[in-house]
């Protein structure tokens, strides 16, 4: 008996979408996904449009022909297909990670262009096991949050859901399904290239591992991650736990923090460091432990700089403080009609007709600006403005948005951005992200 498309796909609610993107490389996993998905959508009364998208990473001479062959197969079976190419210069290091980032960027753009609510990928149970083993080797200990491996659901760029419905299906089961249907697949030779981490794990430790035992460890890691997340969600429900000012400085109640378990404390302070620093990832396990020890008073320093964030321990009941350090702050152009993220912390949209540069003000420049506008603010607020975005026009400081009573250029909009959640949000962390956003908010106000 073959695999059941209804059992595989129904839990994901694909039927509510206008269109669904299937990421198809031509390998057995993605082709198995495509044809099972096609069968499932045919059972729906008003099915979404199925669009197969092949990303040609331009890493091998054969890739263009392979993408073309996927298109011919789709044409034969009445499936829409398009090819997207990664034409950017390829990095000398971190090629696999860069290719993955480019692939998802292209897939998200394809989904937005098609009005698709879902991108569906063919990650299998084998991939899940490999991911666990890769992350375990990197982390060096079993408490790492990443050992929960891949989530069946993720949210990409805040708008497109990534579904991985085959995480409980083996690669061999998909190949048996394709063989039964008489459909051939292509084996990418890079999958056997041990210069890359995943093939090295696949052909080494994963081949010798007890798959069922690994899956049990994944479940245990997932449960631990859920416990820590739930503790933070509960803590964040209390408004006294966490506060924020306009520039993004966060104030963590020391007593609320101390009441959490060590694992939850490490997660909480690591998360706030990532938000303050505008980073897409948590600090590593060792860094999170270091932050927790400092805030808990186990280590002598009262200040740490981690991940672009300056973290200060509160004393005598004062809150712990998290803010951006004043280094490596970017300068970006903001032209009419443009939507950009500045420093991973603020999102700007220019619906007006003027162009600006966004950058932090210099200290003397800010002092002169305040003097010329007849303003006088205390030192703490001035320091906050120095790590906040300002608007320049024609090389001249035109506006300091977070200054009390500041005049904003017409058509310029700003809101808070959470880089750790707004680009790739694993389903494991949906509730945590909602709790953080509810407490910190998106709207930005003046520094008062």
Swiss-Prot record:
<protein>
    <recommendedName>
        <fullName>tRNA(Ile)-lysidine synthase</fullName>
        <ecNumber>6.3.4.19</ecNumber>
    </recommendedName>
</protein>
<dbReference type="Pfam" id="PF01171">
    <property type="entry name" value="ATP_bind_3"/>
</dbReference>
<keyword id="KW-0436">Ligase</keyword>
<keyword id="KW-0963">Cytoplasm</keyword>
<keyword id="KW-0067">ATP-binding</keyword>
<dbReference type="InterPro" id="IPR014729">
    <property type="entry name" value="Rossmann-like_a/b/a_fold"/>
</dbReference>
<keyword id="KW-0819">tRNA processing</keyword>
<dbReference type="GO" id="GO:0032267">
    <property type="term" value="F:tRNA(Ile)-lysidine synthase activity"/>
</dbReference>
<dbReference type="GO" id="GO:0006400">
    <property type="term" value="P:tRNA modification"/>
</dbReference>
<keyword id="KW-0547">Nucleotide-binding</keyword>
<dbReference type="GO" id="GO:0005737">
    <property type="term" value="C:cytoplasm"/>
</dbReference>
<dbReference type="InterPro" id="IPR012094">
    <property type="entry name" value="tRNA_Ile_lys_synt"/>
</dbReference>
<dbReference type="GO" id="GO:0005524">
    <property type="term" value="F:ATP binding"/>
</dbReference>
<feature type="binding site">
    <location>
        <begin position="25"/>
        <end position="30"/>
    </location>
    <ligand>
        <name>ATP</name>
    </ligand>
</feature>
<comment type="function">
    <text>Ligates lysine onto the cytidine present at position 34 of the AUA codon-specific tRNA(Ile) that contains the anticodon CAU, in an ATP-dependent manner. Cytidine is converted to lysidine, thus changing the amino acid specificity of the tRNA from methionine to isoleucine.</text>
</comment>
<dbReference type="InterPro" id="IPR012795">
    <property type="entry name" value="tRNA_Ile_lys_synt_N"/>
</dbReference>
<comment type="similarity">
    <text>Belongs to the tRNA(Ile)-lysidine synthase family.</text>
</comment>
<dbReference type="InterPro" id="IPR011063">
    <property type="entry name" value="TilS/TtcA_N"/>
</dbReference>
């Amino acid at each position: 008996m073959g695999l059941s498309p209804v059992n595989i796909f129904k839990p994901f609610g694909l039927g509510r979408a206008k269109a669904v993107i299937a990421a198809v490389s031509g390998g057995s996993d993605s082709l198995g996904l495509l044809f099972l998905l096609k069968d499932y959508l045919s059972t729906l009364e008003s099915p979404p449009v199925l669009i197969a998208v092949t990303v040609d990473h331009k890493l091998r001479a054969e890739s263009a022909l392979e993408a073309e062959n996927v298109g011919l197969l789709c044409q034969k079976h009445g499936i829409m297909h398009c090819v997207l190419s990664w034409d950017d210069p390829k990095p000398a290091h971190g090629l696999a990670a860069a290719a993955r980032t480019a692939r998802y960027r292209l897939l998200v753009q394809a989904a937005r262009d098609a009005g698709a609510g879902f991108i569906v990928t063919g990650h299998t149970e084998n991939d899940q096991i490999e991911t666990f083993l890769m992350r375990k080797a990197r982390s060096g200990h079993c408490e790492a949050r990443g050992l929960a491996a891949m989530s069946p659901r993720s949210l990409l760029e805040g708008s497109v859901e990534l579904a991985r419905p085959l995480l409980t299906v083996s690669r061999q089961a998909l190949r048996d399904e394709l063989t039964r249907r008489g459909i051939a697949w292509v084996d990418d030779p890079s999958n056997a290239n041990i210069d890359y981490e995943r093939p090295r794990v696949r052909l080494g430790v994963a081949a010798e591992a007890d798959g069922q035992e690994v899956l049990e460890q994944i479940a245990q890691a997932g449960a631990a991650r859920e416990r820590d997340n739930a503790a933070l969600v509960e803590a964040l429900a209390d408004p006294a736990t966490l506060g924020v000012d306009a520039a993004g400085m966060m104030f963590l109640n020391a007593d609320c923090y101390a009441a959490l378990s060590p694992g939850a404390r490490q997660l909480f302070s690591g998360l706030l460091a990532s938000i303050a620093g505008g980073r897409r990832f948590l600090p590593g396990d060792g860094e999170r432990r270091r932050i927790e020890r400092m805030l808990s008073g186990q280590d002598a320093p009262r200040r740490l700089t981690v991940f672009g964030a300056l973290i200060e321990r509160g004393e005598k009941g004062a809150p712990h403080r998290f803010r951006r350090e004043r280094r490596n702050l970017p300068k970006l152009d903001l032209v009419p009609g443009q939507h950009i993220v500045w420093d991973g912390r603020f999102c700007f949209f220019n619906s007006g007709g003027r162009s600006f540069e966004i950058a932090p003000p210099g200290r003397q420049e800010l002092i002169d600006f305040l003097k010329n506008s007849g303003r006088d603010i205390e030192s703490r607020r001035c320091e906050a403005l120095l790590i906040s975005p300002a608007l320049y026009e024609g090389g001249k400081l035109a506006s300091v948005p977070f200054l009390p009573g500041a005049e904003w250029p017409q058509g310029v909009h700003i809101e808070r951005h959470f880089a750790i959640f707004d680009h790739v949000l694993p389903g494991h962390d949906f509730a945590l992200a909602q709790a953080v956003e509810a407490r910190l908010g998106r709207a930005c106000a003046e520094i008062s």
